[in-house]
Amino acid sequence: MMEQRVSLITLGVDDMELAAAFYEALGWQRAESPDGVIAFDLISQTLGLYPLQALADEVGLPVSELGKGAVSLSYNTRTKEEVALVLAAAEAAGAEILKAAVDVFWGGHHGYFRAPDGQLWEVAFNPFSALSQAGAFRWNGY
C-alpha cells in the first residue's frame, strides 16, 4: 500500500541553470544536492530539476515520448490579491503569462503561466482551502 503523498516532483529541463535561475528569481533557494541535480525544498516536498535527456535515459524512453508541460503544478496563495503579484513576478523572471488572474466559477481566483522550460503553473487563491501558517496546503474542496 502506498501512503497518500508526493515526496518529490522532478521536472525534466533542457537547461538546468536557466531553469534554476527562473525559480531563484521567484525567491526560491536551492537545497544542497549532488552534481547533476538541482533541488528546491518545499513544505513537505522537494522540486527537483534534472536534465531532460538524462531523465529519458533513466526511464528508457526517447525524449519525444516523455511529454512536456502536460501537467499543471499549482501554487496557492494566501490572498486573492497575491495571485496577480505572483504572476507578475513570474513574468518578470521570464515566464509567459497564459491566463491573467480571474475569478473562477467555483469561488476562487487564479491565473496560469508557462515556465521557461515549458512547465505549466497555476497560481490560485482558494478561499475554501486556506494555507496553514507555515504555508502547507490541504484540500478542503470548493
Which residues are covered by each model-predicted region?
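Conserved active-site tyrosine of GNAT-family acetyltransferases
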Residues: A19-E24, A90, G118
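Vicinal oxygen chelate
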Residues: M1-L8, L26-R114, F125-Y142
